[in-house]
């Protein structure tokens, strides 16, 4: 019976992800690179809410202003009164790297949940 618990948990998460993806309110995004370590690792898959307004300390997915065909995953450092955002990495080696200001319209959404790998599944903070 103990083995059933993790299987039921994984099944619940899988169904929840499918329902959310079907609603088109959320999208899934893969983390690529090491700039958001230790919280997010290369290869993590995230559920991103496309309809939430970013706030300071949120982790967001945005179009990279340095390469407009690429998405980036970063933490919101600051939201200006003109809806311009400053983004930053979590990794200490990238501590002095600030991206922006970027328009709020360049933000795809706020990262809500890491669903893969299953062993690291949970809310994104």
Task: Locate the predicted segments by residue.
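Extended hydrophobic leader/signal-anchor segments used for secretion and membrane insertion
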Residues: 1-125
